[in-house]
Amino acid sequence: MSHNQFDKKSQAWSALFSEPMSDLVKRYTASVFFDKRLWQADIAGSLAHADMLAAQKIISSEDHNAIQSGMATISAEIESGAFDWKLELEDVHLNIEARLTQLIGLAGKRLHTGRSRNDQVATDVRLWLRGEIDLIGALLTDLQKALLEVAEKNVEVILPGFTHLQVAQPISFGHHMLAYVEMFSRDAERMSEVRRRTNRLPLGAAALAGTSYPLDRERVAVSLGMVDEKGHPCVCQNSLDAVSDRDFAIEFTAAASLCMVHISRMSEELILWMSQNFGFIKIADRFTTGSSIMPQKKNPDVPELARGKTGRVVGHLMGLITLMKGQPLAYNKDNQEDKEPLFDTVDTLKDTLRIFAEMIGGQLNPATGIKEGGISVNPQAMEQAALKGYATATDLADYLVKKGLPFRDAHETVAHAVKAAITHQVDLSELPLAVLQQFNPGIEKDVYEVLSLRGSLNARDILGGTAPNQVRAQIARHRARLG
């Protein structure tokens, strides 16, 4: 076949076929306009493969040098926007290979020795996803640090804690923020685990059965950084599995879905808290929009969209699982459909993490070195909401238990006290001692220390509790972890 096979034939394998591919089928099967984002991974994998082929004397040093030079030219063309992506060449891999062959001739054809697009694409996606996971890990750190800053400023601010969206017990607003730090720290751990399993080399598996060429797969793995924590090469051990499974992409999307679920839960609270009915917080105007008809409105579009985009990412997870579930070994064209949901999941998660870190923690003003525009807290509104909800009722029950009353009896006694407070439209702490003693004569003046919001907060002085000194200990632990 001539050097110009990619120009004269619709595909690299078309000598077998008696008629060309129709334009409709070309458009239907092409992936180049979304998988071209893999170009850096594709070139990196090809260069590592070429290095190994030369070291194994499978290609000459002259061909090796030509491949390196050609790939440098292609990289420059892509970066400058001069590269001509062609639909008829179907994907990123054949586009780059065709251009390489055009630039350097026969040496470009020899690059594919011992390699199939099946192991090539699996390698590219793993390399690309590894880099994206690293970026996501850094963004998760930024978001956690933003939450820590808010927590540190609001350790002493009292927020009504809720169960069933009913006022339950008073908590530190800082403690509440730290709950999300814990969630995002686990998300970061999951991403790290996904990265470890993603960072394995399929290249050398060829189409499905391996190759008869004496490839040094471990050399390629090391050169691409596909190594474990001790520097040992990580190579896919079964050629069928290497080219056919996309569990690493599914696992990443599952981890991303969990992260988005945590963001969605936080979004729901931000939306509630900034509503007029709560009035607990404000977010900077740049994260809100107005109404086309109601001039008084500031709508929380960013958290609302994040809540909505969570469904989109979870949908991608279901799509990928469904994509894989019916495929026999080894590679099938179905797997081309893994890229758009994977790419969109990565883009959505990165964008969401970036915007939430800024929305919560603010943006650094380079002139002053001070962060501006983060969450603005209304402590008075929070405290009033806690008082209205009889948030210290459990504290009164605990007080009676310490006086010797069984908890179930204490629970019933306090229910009567709350009923009396509701009738008189006062907080429990505002009921006269004589009234409280009607429910249990063992109640004494010290009960008012227990019934105060501050007293309730301070009483939860246990590891993981909401007492301010425990919250500060949590903050210190997270700061040490995040650096």
Curated annotation (Swiss-Prot):
EC top class named in words: lyase
Pathways involved: Amino-acid biosynthesis; L-arginine biosynthesis; L-arginine from L-ornithine and carbamoyl phosphate: step 3/3
Gene3D superfamilies (UniProt xref): Fumarase/aspartase (C-terminal domain), Fumarase/aspartase (Central domain), Fumarase/aspartase (N-terminal domain)
Membrane-spanning residues: none
GO-annotated molecular function: argininosuccinate lyase activity
Subcellular location: Cytoplasm
Gene Ontology annotations for the cellular component aspect, listed alphabetically: cytosol
Superkingdom, taxonomy of origin: Bacteria
Substrates-to-products reaction catalysed: 2-(N(omega)-L-arginino)succinate = fumarate + L-arginine
Keywords: Amino-acid biosynthesis, Arginine biosynthesis, Cytoplasm, Lyase
Family, per entry: Belongs to the lyase 1 family. Argininosuccinate lyase subfamily.
Protein name: Argininosuccinate lyase
Protein's organism: Albidiferax ferrireducens (strain ATCC BAA-621 / DSM 15236 / T118) (Rhodoferax ferrireducens)
